[in-house]
C-alpha cells in the first residue's frame, strides 16, 4: 500500500475503499466477467469474444508510470496520483466486425476517469477530507460506469469508432436478439 488505509481513498490496491465504495478496478472486473471463453481476436488494446450470437468487444487504453520504481515516492501524492504518467494522448480506434446481417442491440459500458471512478469523482468534488454519510452516498450514486444503448442494422459488417482517454476500459456487448442480453 502507498498510503494509510484509514482514510477515504487511502491508496490500497483493493476493489473497494474502506467505506465499501466501488473503485474503478471493481467495475473493470465486472466488464472482464462479461467476456466469453471463445476468443475471436485480440490485439494490443482490445479483445473480441463470442458466445452464440453475442459478441463482447473490450477496448482498453492503459498507461504505466514513468520511472515508477525510481520516482514513485516523489511523484505520487494523495490527491495527484496521475502526475507520474506524463501527458498521454487519447487513443482512436476503428474496429470492423464481420457479423451476419441482421438487427443488433449494442450496450457500451465505460470505466474511465470520468465514468465509474469514485476516486476521480471525489477529486472533482474538491477531495473533501470529511467522509460524511452524505458525501459517501453522493459518491456511491454518481460513480457507476456510464452505459449507452444503441441499435444497428448490419449488412456484412459493423464499424465501431471509439476514442479512448487514457486509463479507460470500454466494453461493447453486441447481441442479435436484444431480449437475451445479460443484465449487470
Model regions and ranges:
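C-terminal beta-sandwich/jelly-roll accessory domains of carbohydrate-active enzymes
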Residues: 60-184
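Aromatic/acidic polysaccharide-binding cleft in carbohydrate-active enzymes
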Residues: 1-77
